[in-house]
């Protein structure tokens, strides 16, 4: 939500809806010095139905799902950063489809107060940017924490399924 712009959740029943206050994520961004330039189109209540957003990399391809307007705006250089929410893929899919960096926080990794969600046990907040460095910058600005350095060696696990022997060698 933003106190100074309509928030319609992609639905006609919320046409002209004006929140009384910012959501926690918008408050944190403003406190960090961000200027909220506008809002992008979203699908109705985060449904997977298309809403007319075009993929700036290829207008004949989908830009993704409900947060696709945010990813497309970043990919098209309209904004350097955008918020998104995810219940089942609404940050990671548009980021991949539009060729930008998408960061989906863990369940309680970022404050979701003031965000209308679908399923509290699945809804998360995320960001879109054109670089990992920009994601780290916004994460640090809104949380007050730096992104921890990963000094662990990668671990790879294989799950042997009943059809394991049918897999081809690489």
Residue ranges and their predicted role:
Residues 3-4, 112-113, 167:
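Short helix/loop capping segments that flank catalytic or ligand/cofactor-binding pockets
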Residues 1-22:
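Enzymes and membrane/adaptor proteins characterized by extended Gly/Ser/Thr/Asp/Glu-rich
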Residues 11-14, 56-59, 63, 162-166:
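Short, contiguous strand/loop micro-motifs
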Residues 17-23, 164-169:
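Active-site core of PLP-dependent enzymes with the aminotransferase class I/II
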Residues 141-170:
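Gly/Ser-rich, acidic/histidine-flanked active-site/gating loops
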Residues 21-139:
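Short glycine/serine-rich loop segments
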Residues 1-8, 35-42, 151:
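Conserved small-residue hinge/capping positions at short loops/turns
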